[in-house]
Amino acid sequence: MSLLVQVISLVVISVVVIIIPPCGAALGRIKA
């Protein structure tokens, strides 16, 4: 069970790291 949680956490972190920077840059450009 804990292994499953670790795998899910790793996937979520990977997705966030991949998706968040472009979104942040886009929001920064829009606000600027």
Curated annotation (Swiss-Prot):
Pfam families listed in its UniProt record: IlvGEDA_leader
Disulfide bridge map: none
InterPro entries: IlvGEDA_leader (IPR012567)
Alphabetically ordered keywords of this record: Amino-acid biosynthesis, Branched-chain amino acid biosynthesis, Leader peptide
Biological process, per Gene Ontology: amino acid biosynthetic process; branched-chain amino acid biosynthetic process
Alphabetized NCBIfam families for the sequence: PRK10424.1
Protein's UniProt name: ilv operon leader peptide
Origin species: Edwardsiella tarda
